[in-house]
Amino acid sequence: MSSASDISEEELIELEEELKKLETKDKISKQLQDKHERAEKEFKPYLKTPKITRVSTGIPELDQALEGGVPKGSWIAITGEPGTGKSILCMHFAWAGLKAGDPVVYVTTEAEFRDVVKQARLFGMDFEQYKIYDISSGKEPDIPPHIVVIDIFGLLKIARQISESMPLDTESARKRRFAALDIQTLIAAIHEAYKVLGVLKEGSKSPVKHVRLIIDSLSAFWADKPAMARKYSYELKIASHRENVTAYLVSQYAMTTKSTFGFGLEHIADGVFHLWMDDVETKKEVSRYFIIKKMRMTNHEKR
């Protein structure tokens, strides 16, 4: 083994140089680490995952499966065959909104709203505690209501109004006639509801307050033209989708094709709730099921 006296002067110089290099490397490493820590501290606020504001569905178990609710501003398609509970989901969503102070636009093409009120009461939800305004009413409300109802009669009224406001066609000398179940009639009715609720600034189409929009069901608007479902869905979303509007859109499920009646709504929706039941003739009982097929910006339950 070599002793210190065996090391030559040249070797000592080399060792000193190596030590200096190591010290320099340590200094550089420390400087880089300090810079990294400073940068991390400086940019940490910008690297955080943005907080998603969530809207309660009105069903605690479903909220839990959705990390607290659906993202605010989402459009949720609710699909399923008759009798699976689609309308009941809508009632819970509306009720949660009323309790939270959110105004509600409730479009119902499947039943009269008075029947919705009766059914909701069976589940402990009394909509008549709140001010309800039917858009088919000829009288303007004295104060903004909590719920604006748009049923087939309201749609007929809006269709008549926009038909009368249309200019004459120069070739046919006739006006375009809008039907109650025309998608443009629905869009006009929704915007009229926003005005009645008092949530629009003058000249704006975007509500300044969060609104819950329920359409039960959209299938009625393309019942005679299911191939147009995607086009109509896009038209509705372009015209009515706003950051301050969270929507439930019901679509009937065709038993023959095992898919939604009209292709396209699920594609434009941010989330899809699907409901179904076992074949009652085979099972001899009613067994209903529910699954979250998709929900953007949400790590939702998968079963």
Indicate residue ranges for each PLM-predicted region.
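Walker A/P-loop NTP-binding active-site region of P-loop NTPases
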Residues: A65-I147
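Conserved P-loop NTPase
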Residues: K20, K30-Q33, E37, T53, ...
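Conserved nucleotide-binding/hydrolysis micro-motifs of P-loop NTPases
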Residues: E110-R114, L122, F153-I158, S219-A220, ...
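Interdomain "pre-motor" coupling segment immediately N-terminal to P-loop NTPase/helicase cores
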Residues: S2-E40
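Phosphate-binding/switch loop-helix module in NTP-utilizing enzymes
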Residues: I150-H241
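Loop/turn-to-beta-strand initiation segments
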Residues: P103, H146, V208-R212, R242-V250
